[in-house]
């Protein structure tokens, strides 16, 4: 997984992002670029977390989108599933 991350992330961000993936039991799926979204988070029925990310040549876009989706995961775990996707709880977490 680390080797794959080097293709999509700035080199200095790979270790931190890899640690986030391990610590939060994230299944990261990199897909062909979609026009409607850069990334997506959802919790699977088995409790594992799925983050789907567009494959992009822009490593900084990938990084910001990854952090954005991890913030959804953490906000939902801390505050429950009934919060608004980009509400105050998510904004607090994304900081």
Which role fits each region the language model picked out?
Residues 69:
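Walker B catalytic acidic pair
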């Amino acid at each position: 997984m680390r080797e794959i991350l080097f293709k999509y992330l700035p080199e200095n961000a790979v270790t931190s992002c890899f640690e986030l993936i391990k610590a939060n039991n994230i299944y990261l799926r990199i897909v062909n670029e979609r026009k409607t979204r850069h990334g997506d988070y959802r919790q699977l029925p088995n409790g594992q977390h799925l983050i789907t990310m567009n494959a992009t040549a822009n490593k900084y876009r990938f990084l910001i989108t990854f952090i954005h989706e991890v913030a959804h995961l953490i906000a939902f775990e801390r505050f429950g599933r009934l919060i608004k996707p980009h509400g105050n709880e998510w904004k607090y977490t994304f900081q």
